[in-house]
A protein has these predicted regions:
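Non-catalytic cap/lid and distal C-terminal segments of serine-dependent acyl enzymes
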Residues: 1-249
């Protein structure tokens, strides 16, 4: 790989542990990358995603900041009720907002408009963080996501933690000044194939439904559905990322 690469560990008091962040590039717009379910910071590189946009990185148009997930202890732990999974996700949110984003700002020599990117469960994270913190993240690029955690083997009573981490729920009830602000502040790109595993993961149906919800609320978004020969897998996401990223940096 030709691009500049630096790995660091950022301690999180909320998680009680350090998480890995890998930066790729030397200059450009910061792009915060969430891995797929239970993924690690190096998954993007290992699956060819960094190379797919390596020319943009080399040219100083963007810098990638790839982070660890916390899914194994939160969303992916199906032994826990959904409310507890969402509560545990809150620790991860504290790490991202309280530790990772400030580190990105320092690395960029000041505040900068961050893009979030994610594939599969990473797409959920990219959208959820952008919708909740559009002041920090005005653009989310989401590939093959399922945006409704209540569909993830959910059980148990649901309270505020589950509600405020389910974009389908809280976007449905957005109104007033905050909705008007989001309409002028935020944009989401929703990309999904129609091939193998996009239906069984729920990604295709969820992407369509989420796009319809955003349209009903007047929130800027773009829905890009690829063909029936485009599966829910890394080769698809490499091509889709390389296709879309040049427009935003």
């Amino acid at each position: 790989m030709r691009v500049n690469r630096e790995m660091t560990e950022l301690w999180s008091a909320a998680l009680g542990a350090a998480g890995t962040v890998i930066r790729y590039g030397h200059w450009g717009r910061p792009v915060l990358v969430f891995p797929s379910e239970r993924g690690r910071a190096w998954d993007f590189e290992n699956n060819g995603m960094v190379d797919a946009i390596g020319g943009l990185i080399d040219d100083g148009r963007l810098k990638l900041y790839c982070v660890d997930s916390f899914d194994a202890a939160s969303w992916s732990n199906h032994d826990l009720p959904l409310e507890e999974r969402a509560r545990r996700h809150g620790r991860y949110e504290s790490w991202i907002v309280g530790d990772v984003v400030p580190w990105i700002y320092r690395d960029c020599n000041g505040p900068a408009e961050v893009i979030t990117v994610g594939c599969s469960m990473g797409a959920f994270h990219a959208a959820n963080f952008a919708l909740k913190r559009a002041d920090l993240i005005p653009l989310a690029m989401c590939f093959s996501g399922n945006y409704d955690p209540s569909a993830w083997h959910a059980w148990g009573e649901r309270g505020n933690q589950a509600y405020f981490n389910n974009p389908v729920d809280y976007v449905s009830h957005l109104e007033g000044d905050h909705l008007e602000w989001l309409r002028g502040q935020l944009s989401l790109l929703l990309v999904c194939g129609q091939g193998r595993w996009e239906d069984t993961t729920g990604a295709l149906d969820s992407t369509r439904r989420f796009a319809a919800l955003l349209a009903a609320k007047g929130i800027k978004h773009e829905l890009d559905l690829w063909g029936h020969d485009v599966p829910h897998d890394w080769p698809s996401w490499r091509v889709q990322l390389a296709h879309h990223m040049p427009r935003f940096c």
